[in-house]
Regions:
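Transmembrane alpha-helix signature in integral membrane proteins
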Residues: 79-107
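Interhelical loop and adjacent transmembrane-helix boundary motif
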Residues: 234-282
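Transmembrane alpha-helices
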Residues: 177-178, 200-236
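Amphipathic cytosolic juxtamembrane alpha-helices at the membrane-cytosol interface
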Residues: 21, 100, 113-118, 186-187, ...
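Generic hydrophobic transmembrane alpha-helix motif, especially the helices
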Residues: 125-170
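C-terminal transmembrane helix and the adjacent membrane-cytosol boundary/short C-terminal tail
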Residues: 179-183, 187, 194, 261-303
């Protein structure tokens, strides 16, 4: 690169419009760096706060211990029941919520009458705005007794109730992002298939959904993040006993509810252990995003 071309690229602003452009670019840069700094600071804080307890307890005892008795004379800090409960709860909510959300998105994007689409979209937007505590309250008053009665259990506060509540809570994220992704599919894809004699259902499931898979996957990840990070609603319907989740009807504690339940009165090593649980949860979220990026990049290369 010669000196003149370099000077043209880095020339100082001369007119008011140039100065405004430079200032706005700097503001955009600061906003981007602010987001990066927030992630870095949160990561550093979680590591600094969570590692000491893991070091004191022992990483194997902490991650794979099956007993949690943080207030006992000889406290135990095994979080394997919390990890498995969170994994099972999130997996169950995903299994229930993703098909419903995806089919709803296909209906809204491709098949719904405009008036009906408006009604459904409004309902989904309202669903996304309902506070977590309201979901928990409705689950506690309606779902928990219904589960107990339907399956003949003494209490319906269990893993199954948590899964049902979470599957409802993740629907708005999955539906809204999937609808946007499906609407972005070029019409030529569908028109070409229609000209070849494909039915609407074949076009939707063999053309539209595969073409929108990146956006749909992003919606699923948002839903998974909502499910694995939810605390209040789950705490009201899951039972909050530190049991291994060996049954759908078992009263369980998830990673998030363990923190919310004990942080208000925790101190010393117990408080440090709760920060360690938060660190484990933070790592889970990061791993989910990394796996998604790897899968999507692999899919794009295959295409």
């Amino acid at each position: 690169m010669n000196k003149k071309s370099y000077l043209r690229r880095v020339r100082l602003p001369r007119t008011p419009a140039d100065w405004l452009e430079a200032v706005m670019n700097f503001i955009f840069f600061l906003c981007g760096m602010l987001a990066v700094c927030c992630v870095v600071l949160i990561s550093v804080y979680m590591v600094v706060s969570g590692v000491p307890a893991i070091h004191k307890i022992g990483i194997f005892k902490f991650l794979f211990g099956t007993k949690w008795a943080s207030t006992a004379a000889e406290p135990l800090f095994g979080i394997l029941p919390f990890i498995l409960s969170s994994v099972y709860g999130t997996l169950g909510a995903t299994i229930l919520g993703v098909p419903i959300g995806l089919l709803t998105a296909v209906f809204l994007s491709k098949a719904a009458d405009p008036k009906l689409r408006t009604v459904v979209v409004t309902a989904i937007e309202l669903l996304s705005g309902i506070p977590s505590v309201v979901f928990g309250l409705l689950g506690m008053q309606v779902l928990v007794p219904a589960v107990a009665k339907a399956f003949g259990k003494a209490s319906g506060a269990c893993l199954l109730s948590a899964i049902v509540v979470l599957s409802i809570m993740i629907l708005p994220s999955i539906v809204s992002v999937s609808v946007t992704a499906l609407n972005a599919v070029p019409p030529e894809y569908e028109q070409s298939s229609l000209a070849l004699g494909a039915t609407d259902t074949e076009i939707w499931f063999k053309i539209s959904i595969p073409a929108a898979k990146s956006g749909i996957a992003a919606g699923v990840v948002l839903g998974i993040g909502r499910a694995i990070g939810e605390a209040m609603a789950v705490m009201m319907v899951a039972g909050n006993s530190p049991n291994m989740p060996d049954s759908l009807f078992r009263s369980v504690t998830l990673l998030t509810t363990a923190i919310a339940k004990e942080m208000s009165y925790a101190g010393g090593l117990q408080r440090q252990a709760l920060f360690s649980i938060a660190l484990v949860l933070f790592v889970f979220i990061m791993l989910i995003n990394v796996v998604l990026n790897v899968v999507l990049k692999g899919g794009n290369r295959d295409e």
